[in-house]
């Protein structure tokens, strides 16, 4: 797709993994309370979260879907693959979630995408609540690995 533009959002791995874990636990509760939700999600092929979760990547060290380490490992597999295979593509743009509340960042992103022609765009749309304190215990080793990948994306995005 040579004429396509791909926007790939990147979020701080610990914050992202915690958010994914919360969604997973939320869907597990919903599906335990109402089996129709579980069956419907299966029917439409949405197994990203919940009782019938299917990993996007085969877990290596962390198999417990109800623990943040599992979601950190999944983050690592996914974004390491994206970085290694797509970082040199001119039509792939990596959008750093934590910077979406920065007006200069948004303006530069729109200029790079040649989308800054509409001066009526509301550029201060995002209010990012970052750096939430994560209460879950996590493996610092897997977290360090995810941070290295995240920092590689930050370097691309200057």
In which residue ranges do the predicted regions lie?
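Short hydrophobic/aromatic-enriched beta-strand-loop microsegments
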Residues: 4-11, 29-30, 117-120
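PAPS-dependent sulfotransferases, especially Golgi type II membrane carbohydrate sulfotransferases
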Residues: 44-158
